[in-house]
Amino acid sequence: MNIKPEEITSIIRQQIENFNTNIETIDSGTIIQIGDGIARVYGLEDCMEGELIEFPNDVYGMALNLEQDNVGCVLLGSEEGIKEGNVVKRTKKVVEVPVGEALVGRVVNSLGMPIDGKGPVLTTETRDVEVPAPGVIDRQSVKEPLQTGIKAIDSMIPIGKGQRELIIGDRQTGKTAIAMDTILNQKGKDVICIYVAIGQKQSTVAHIVNDLTKMGAMDYTIVVSSTASDSAPLQYLAPYAGCSMGEYFMHKGKDVLIVYDDLSKHAVAYRTMSLLLRRPPGREAYPGDVFYLHSRLLERSARLSEKLGGGSLTALPIVETLAGDVTAYIPTNVISITDGQIFLESELFNAGQRPAVNAGISVSRVGGNAQIKAMKQVAGTLRLELAQYRELAAFSQFGSDLDKESVKRLEKGKRLVEILKQPQYGPMPVEKEIIILYAAVSNHLIDIPVNKIKEFEKELFNYIDTHYRDIGKDILEHKQLTDELKSKLDKAINDFKNVFLSEI
């Protein structure tokens, strides 16, 4: 057998030419401890804080503790089948969620995966979960109102687009109801709403989604749900994921409303993670950076400058108190971060005043600039008159004789309190709020019996819609009560009052 050296040479040359020199380097580590949804990994030398780590069984984790000899990761899925000695890999990416129009009308989890059984979310765009908040130059002041449709709030504690307004109160005082009514009131106003449920019962979230669907509000709403059965890391991520979804629309120049329900459970989830990661506990066993946990989330709400499109992200964080104690750690933290708070009281709620807003300690620090002039005109003295009424009501319980002026104030106060009551799922257009508040403040209701006020209000709107339809249009158009408009309103109210009183 003749072996020709030229043939061997050509074969070797061909092999060398076809040899692929692609070398793939994978930064990997080894699990040295796992349990309670926390994994400690040896290796991963150049790992970033918040980086996604790939575990076996298609489970991902997030690196949170970067220590000298190991990395502490929280698992974003089940730890079943993962054991010590398994190899994990770096992805060199941080946690991101899908964003875009395709999410509107859907119910998703903290990672943006659909959980409503309506198929995949058809979007290719993603956004990091943790994004720095816009700087001072990138913002403009809050000057446009975001109407909640709730008389007590729009008049005394107004909310502007780009504001952070805390809703705080004990359990079962109607906190979620206020947030829901605000979402319902955005119908037809080109506002995208995001409801983030953190640590809620699955049945509660299903009930909320059902109500939103029934009222036609899911057409402009995204629900991000991380229920009580989800792991602490998923509950921790939920508000940041919802915020990133909202920021996508904000940077497109749209107005967004986001509700975090609630941040007390969010802080508890973060405390759970921190204690399992062996971070030192502080006050109430929360870690030292629990203030930063919420401040970096809420600072992302803003009204962007015109140069950046003028979009806005308005936040309504909810915090639950225990026995009305607003001096606890999380409530004081969030009060100091937000631009005001709506305080709900169990006593008022149980006494039948719903929404149970305590106007005395509720405040909106920036919303006043956003209020339309007509509302300022009717609501200017409202808070003071209510405060005087409460003082007089407490004083009159001692049965002492009151002068005529005090009796008059008491009677007016009773009617104001009655006017501010409102049923759930009954948000009111701003022009109707102004009409009825004008009637109350201008002493038009003083001769209407208190138990007939609700009936009077309902029938007054029907009467105005039939006989004085242009009043509402004029209020929306001029955004202030001119002398001409006031006299027209006086005439309409008096005309109807005569009819109403004759029928009683």
From Swiss-Prot:
It catalyses: ATP + H2O + 4 H(+)(in) = ADP + phosphate + 5 H(+)(out). It is a peripheral membrane protein. It is found in: Cell membrane. Its EC number is 7.1.2.2. It holds the Pfam family ATP-synt_ab. ATP binds at residues 169-176. PROSITE patterns: ATPASE_ALPHA_BETA (PS00152). Keywords: ATP synthesis, ATP-binding, Cell membrane, CF(1), Hydrogen ion transport, Ion transport, Membrane, Nucleotide-binding, Translocase, Transport. The keyword Nucleotide-binding applies. It comes from the Bacteria. It is an enzyme of class 7 (translocase). Produces ATP from ADP in the presence of a proton gradient across the membrane. The alpha chain is a regulatory subunit. Belongs to the ATPase alpha/beta chains family. This is ATP synthase subunit alpha. It comes from Clostridium botulinum (strain Loch Maree / Type A3).
